[in-house]
């Protein structure tokens, strides 16, 4: 993501993005002095939804780049294929870049994979799709990812890689090679375990008085509104002192995340049960 922002974004370039979103993308845009126009997801009837007409109308001739993270961190929201098609057609017509972060593409609970813009793309589209081994293969921290991009960008990306990461160490390449050879087994087991952990967590959350939430169809986060709080960072600090459980404050994911908390459920069942038992007195008053 940082490489792409270095390549595309410059002073005052307008970037349209959907929030709440992983904070590093916002930081990468601001480091290049880009201007962010954020369209916020809304929680309606237990589902995260976007005002899609508002999104399309926000992407104009002034827009340099549109950023989509689907499935999304922190919400688990997935952009439907029909919306992907309409958005891609819109950016194609305007000639702006569409960046799709699809690192949770295989972490889904109702389908084998989530919809990808690559299924709709044409060779000359100004489309860049980002993926990673971190989520699908439990290789977080190995910093192995890949970019699907138009041929014209190849030499420019290579130059940026040369002065940043240079290359992937051989033993990490071997690990990824093994993961790719066994990807069906690995991702099947991962999804099965994550779904079990998700269900344990949300069987509690949906019944807590102070919590309003959506059960995610993808990724591995619970992102929920806590009724009555307007400073999620302060509340998260208090939770650590009261329960010894660390959660991510929603404001870290942008202004639209304020009043929410995020918990990762990529953990063993016994661990999930323990943290929910600790959190219940604070969130189910």
Enumerate the language-model features and the residues they cover.
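PLP-dependent class I/II
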Residues: 1-285
């Amino acid at each position: 993501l940082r490489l792409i922002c270095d390549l595309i974004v410059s002073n005052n370039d307008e970037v349209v993005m959907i929030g709440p979103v992983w904070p590093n993308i916002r930081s990468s845009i601001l480091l290049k002095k880009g201007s962010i126009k954020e369209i916020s997801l809304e929680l309606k009837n237990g589902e995260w939804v976007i005002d899609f007409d508002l999104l399309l109308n926000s992407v104009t001739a002034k827009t340099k780049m549109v950023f989509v993270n689907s499935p999304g961190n922190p919400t688990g929201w997935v952009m439907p294929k029909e919306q992907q098609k309409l958005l891609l057609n819109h950016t194609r017509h305007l000639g702006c870049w569409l960046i799709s972060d699809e690192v949770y593409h295989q972490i889904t609970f109702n389908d084998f994979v989530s919809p990808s813009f690559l299924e709709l793309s044409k060779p000359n589209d100004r489309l860049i799709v980002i993926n990673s081994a971190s989520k699908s293969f439990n290789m977080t921290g190995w910093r192995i990812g890949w970019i699907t991009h138009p041929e014209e960008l190849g030499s420019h990306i290579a130059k940026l890689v040369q002065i940043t990461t240079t290359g992937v160490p051989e033993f990490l390449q071997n690990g990824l090679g093994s993961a790719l050879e066994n990807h069906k087994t690995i991702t099947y087991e991962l999804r099965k375990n994550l779904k079990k952990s998700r269900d344990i967590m949300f069987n509690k959350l949906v019944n807590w008085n102070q919590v309003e939430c959506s059960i995610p169809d993808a990724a591995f986060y619970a992102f929920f509104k806590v009724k009555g709080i307007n400073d999620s960072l302060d509340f998260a600090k208090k939770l650590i002192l009261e329960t010894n459980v660390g959660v991510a404050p929603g404001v870290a994911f942008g202004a639209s995340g304020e009043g929410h908390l995020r918990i990762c459920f990529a953990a063993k069942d016994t661990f999930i049960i323990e943290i929910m038992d600790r959190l219940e007195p604070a969130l189910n008053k």
